[in-house]
Amino acid sequence: MSENNNDKTTGKKTLTLKRSVLETSTVKQNFSHGRTKAVVVETKRRKITRPDEKAEPLQPITKPHVAPQRSKPRFEEKKPQEAMAKSNLSSAEMEARLRALEEAHIQEKITREQAEKEARLAKEREEILKQEIQEQEILQKQEEEKPTVPISSVSSDPSLIEKTDIPIVPKNTTVIEKRKIDENQEEERHSRRANPAKSEIRAPKIVKGADERRRGKLTLNSALDEEGSARGRSMAAMRRRQEKFKRAQNQEPREKISREVVLPETITIQELAQRMTERSVDVIKFLMKQGQMMKPGDVIDADVAELIAVEFGHTVKRVLESDVEEGIFNITDNPQNMQPRPPVVTIMGHVDHGKTSLLDAIRKANVVSGEAGGITQHIGAYQVEQNGQKITFIDTPGHAAFTAMRARGARVTDIAVLVVAADDSVMPQTIESINHAKAAGVPIIVAINKIDKPAANAQKVRTELLQHEVFVETMGGETLDVEVSAKTGQNLDKLLEAILLQAEMLDLKADPQRTAEGVVIEAKLDRGRGSVATVLVQKGTLHPSDIIVAGNEWGRVRALIDDHGRHVKEAVPSTPIEILGMQGTPQAGDRFAVVTHEAKAREISEYRQRLARDKAVARQTGSRGSLEQMMTKLQTTGVKEFSLIIKGDVQGSIEAIASALEKLGNDEVRARVVHSGAGGITESDISLAEASNSAVIGFNVRANKQARDFAKTQGIEIRYYNIIYDLVDDIKAAMSGLLSPEQRETFLGNAEILEVFNITKIGKVAGCRVTEGKIERGAGVRLIRDNIVIHEGKLKTLKRFKDEVNEVQSGQECGIAFENYEDMRAGDIIETFRIEHINRTL
């Protein structure tokens, strides 16, 4: 007896009373993901008994003295062991061993039942598979017994018959594939089974003359069968059927469609092919035939593109890049919607004649105190109301540097108010303002200001205006004139009445129901709000969320702010308004218009930016030329450039500064604005100044902390200004420092060489007598022989007798030696002179 509790089913068991008559076999199960399991199946052979015999009853396991006859020798061997165990083991140990034997028998019984169950399930699966195969064979036979249409074309035209035997594929491919899921499993199962009973699945027989049309294959034997059986469709018929199906599916080459191709001035090959709906490869092949090797990304001009499009059978419509701007400003007004609009009045005149003060008195505000130096350096737009009627005022600077601003103000105005100081009369900027107003074709109203001063002489002003073809009413003309005082407010109401009277005569009307259109008065870059443009709406009504194009920039209107800082919902004609939401800062004087969608606005903006860039490049190329030309020009002319980076608060001021600096240069030095823009000074401006060796100028703006630190590190000075006079004066002084000083030569005297001495360690020394003026030590000298200057240099030694002296007067003798020159002869004349350097100014 063994104490090992081994519950595995094997051929030999140690804890049995008799050898079990079992037949073993192994069943291998396959699961998903490649897992397998082997199960041992034991089949007990039944004992055959006769009817008159009784089965031998099973003896209880716990009685060792009862033993089966077949195991008698084995039992007899165990007898002394059990007797010995009885004598040596206690009752508790004996019970434990008997209990272990019982558990082993129970485990063996469970294992045997599981194996029988697995074998039964495997047999059932095999029977189900056989049944399915039989059903498939029956269905296949029924299908093949159906009548088929005979094929006459095959017998009539044997040349169309395929001459190679084509194997026939059975229809029960799904069943065969099901059988072949795991071929190794079936082979192993049948090889290990004790009573192998393989059920070979034979391919179903194909009935002669069956419908082979479904297979699409035909053999020579079946086509030439003489028994008159039904024949399938020929291969030629199958091909014709496939070609017909392809034609039905439009798989043949499509018919060429002629299109109208829009061609700009330049276009890439890829884009041209897309517009023609052709392949770019075909276009490139056509160009290769013409002898041009090009790529899809290459740019061709409109002429070549037109030839290609015509060759491919398309019509061409040529357009210009400027066509994107068509229809923006050419919108016609509806006469039925025309309504009266407020007049736009521009205040013009000489500097310090009281233009802004007059406007302040009308607006009852104080703008002058906010302007640096008491002078207007920005163009401002305001709106006032008089007797229920609105008047839009545009204030322009009077300084000479703001000529462009005055011209811009005159172009957008309806009436020009010419302010002339009664104590100062007509001045240069007054004349310029008159010319601007006449060029713009707007009527003029003369406002004679400062009439309250004792030195005021209004009649003198009227008389001087006659010289410039401005005829006031008191002098028999048609121009209105009003004597006013901005300080006391005298006759301001008369001035406003004159403006309204002139506007009534002009009959100003506009259509508020159309899209907005106008002009940019001023533009700046605000730190918190971004690009801010002050515009004057001339036509239509401007609303928030409108998409506008102003010059080279575009944007969507985020907010509309009036001259009092209030947000408004719309801006009607003749209204000055601030716009927020521009993508960039437009230039003052640019026209703006509302467009329908964002794509068009972006296209117009990109076209204008490209045009401005090309003009700038052409201007630089024309002024610079090639490198050799530039170097030759620098060597011959010696022009020096004073590079500047200008940052200002608004575009108009930057424009005025650049215009003033252009007038400062001469043939030797000139100012060059490397970069200019509205907004504060940033670190990138300092980097650009370092790279271009430029000076940084801030006009009414400041540098941020990063820019200041970087400028301090790089040693770049930043100059701040708020008055344009001071800026221009400082730049003028700095540019004057670049001018080469003027050299002025002063004649000192002449000396005649009497004899030349050769002295050791010194060289040749000329013994001379001063014949005119004096000879000074360190002066410049010229050696003249036969009235020809043969040497010019400096005086090295001047001695009288044996002593070094600073100067020798006329009539005295002295010894003279030259620096690095010794070719002196008796009779030569030595001329001495002094050169003075005098600084020049612009």
From Swiss-Prot:
Residues 374-378 are annotated as: G2. It comes from the Bacteria. GTP binds at residues 349-356, 395-399, 449-452. The keyword Electron transport does not apply. Residues 449-452 are annotated as: G4. Residues 42-91, 139-253 are annotated as: Disordered. PROSITE patterns: G_TR_2, IF2. It is found in: Cytoplasm. Gene3D superfamilies: P-loop containing nucleotide triphosphate hydrolases, Translation factors, Translation initiation factor IF- 2, domain 3. Residues 349-356 are annotated as: G1. The keyword Cell inner membrane does not apply. Its main location: cytoplasm. CDD domains: IF2_eIF5B, IF2_mtIF2_II, mtIF2_IVc. Signal peptide: none annotated. GO terms for cellular component: cytosol. Coiled coil: none annotated. Residues 485-487 are annotated as: G5. Keywords: Cytoplasm, GTP-binding, Initiation factor, Nucleotide-binding, Protein biosynthesis. One of its GO terms (molecular function) is GTPase activity. Residues 176-190, 199-214 have a biased composition (Basic and acidic residues). One of the essential components for the initiation of protein synthesis. Protects formylmethionyl-tRNA from spontaneous hydrolysis and promotes its binding to the 30S ribosomal subunits. Also involved in the hydrolysis of GTP during the formation of the 70S ribosomal complex. Belongs to the TRAFAC class translation factor GTPase superfamily. Classic translation factor GTPase family. IF-2 subfamily. This is Translation initiation factor IF-2. It comes from Bartonella tribocorum (strain CIP 105476 / IBS 506).
